[in-house]
């Protein structure tokens, strides 16, 4: 095998690893609440990653009967936002929100740190999504609006 062939093989392997990492850093998890998904976003945030996460969520919504999408930013702090100004981050999050809304699904954002919230507010971006402090609070809210209760058996 010559040098060019070897480079192509390595480039393909890198693409495969990047795809695997992207899947692991924003898995789509079905919730105990019917028609609800949880998407924990972890790792460094870049515009390209947010676009891929948005596409992944929209494809999942298209293929499944989803009413609520809980996007969990617990792992994301201002220092985990790479090469992207906070205005751009706000725009990407707004695009995610608008896209989910256009699919007929209600987005919920949870786990935003006070620092991240402050930066989004200062950027002037208006988010059209309900927010909760954490995943548990969002689940309690969804259980209430869906008249669901947990019972011991």
Predicted regions and their residues:
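STAS-typified acidic loop motif
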Residues: 27-55
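Non-catalytic signal-transmission and effector/linker regions of two-component phosphorelay proteins
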Residues: 146-153
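Short acidic-hydrophobic, aromatic-tinged amphipathic segments that line or gate anion-handling sites
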Residues: 128-138
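Conserved beta-strand segments of the P-loop GTPase G domain that flank and frequently precede/overlap
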Residues: 39-42, 70-74, 110
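Long, leucine- and charge-enriched amphipathic alpha-helices
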Residues: 1-27
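Alpha-helix N-cap and loop-to-helix initiation/capping positions
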Residues: 48-52, 84-91, 130
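A short, well-ordered alpha-helical element
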Residues: 47-69
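Amphipathic alpha-helical interaction surfaces in cytosolic regulatory modules
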Residues: 75-122
